[in-house]
Amino acid sequence: MSAPASKKNFRLLAAVVIVIIVVVAGVGAYYYSSTGSSSSTVMSSTMASSTMMSQTSTPLILYSADSFVIEATMLESAFTSSTGIMMAPPKSGGSLLLASEIAQGNPVSVFISLSHSAVTASNLKNESSGWAIAFASDQMTLAYSNATLQNSAANATVAACNSALAADTNSSWNTCFTMLTSGSVKIGTGNPNADPSGYRGWIVLEAAGQAFANDSSFYENRLISNNGNVTAASAADLIAPLQTGQIQFLWIYKSSAVAHKLNYLQLPGRVNLGSSKYSSFYSKFSYQLATGVQTGGVIRLWITAPTDSTDTADSLQFVAFVVKNAPTLLSPYGLVPTTPAKLYNSTTVPPLLQQLVSEGLLQPSGPNTG
């Protein structure tokens, strides 16, 4: 082969080698880029999943008055659906008992109570955040079941009380309460020192005595002397005995009766602790607890986030959700939403609550004492 031909073939071979190197390098770069991007995506997804898991691995802990636990469960579900923030099933009990547990340092995020004093420093001690919100009102009723109507004395009492509701005269209501306290029927009552519905049942009897018998202690003393009262730790503990006929009536909140699909006697606004029109009349009556005197007043639902809330930011989101959505979500249970909700505070409230005040959803209403 001649020298010029050899040089020509060499240059051709070199060019081919360079092309092969470029192609291989390009394929390698593409492969690295593709797999690197995929790995990066997988890592990002893993980190996002890890972050999501860390956010949801510790659900909010709601302490709820046991008479409100069905509604509380509904609020939790709606909140989680709206925000993605997880919540544990409500821990329920009497409001005063729950306040005592919170004061002892038990883990809690948010507290819903049916007693104002339970959300103040008098019961929460150092766990009081200094603020609480009243977001709905309730009233007392006497629940009864189908088993109640199998008892002739109870059946007659239901008829008399329904007639009193229609007539709405002092004499007809006197007949109703006289039959209720005769001892021929049993009335269940939650422990007043643990469950506010308990002392409120006694306050209703005092108000009724004054309104219909001109003696505030008349029906109260009559029920006690006739052994007509049955007490348990809470009203919730007496629902099963009511349904089986062991007791014929139960002092309970209207919302709880509705939530548990119980029949109930509608009591007049003058005595049911549910009408702001009669708030001054309610305040004339009281009940002595182990921790002090409880005065009659309109029944309200309260919400607060204790000082050592397990997650203050998410807890405040739940509080805001309840304030904003109570009118829609709670009305079907017989509760009357408070609009705007009433804020009671003895300290500066968090910015989120200040925003609700600015939006007209919260109304400053005084110090959080009681």
Where are the regions that the model predicts?
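Exported/periplasmic ABC-transporter solute-binding proteins
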Residues: 54-83, 91, 95-96, 100-103, ...
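Ligand-binding clamshell of periplasmic/extracellular solute-binding protein-like
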Residues: 89-101, 105-129, 135-137, 143-144, ...
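Secretory targeting signatures
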Residues: 1-55, 370
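Short, charge-rich binding segments
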Residues: 132-134, 178-179
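Generic beta-strand structural signal
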Residues: 131, 140, 185-187
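Hydrophobic aliphatic residue packing
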Residues: 16-24, 85, 102, 235
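N-terminal helicase ATP-binding lobe
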Residues: 129-130, 366
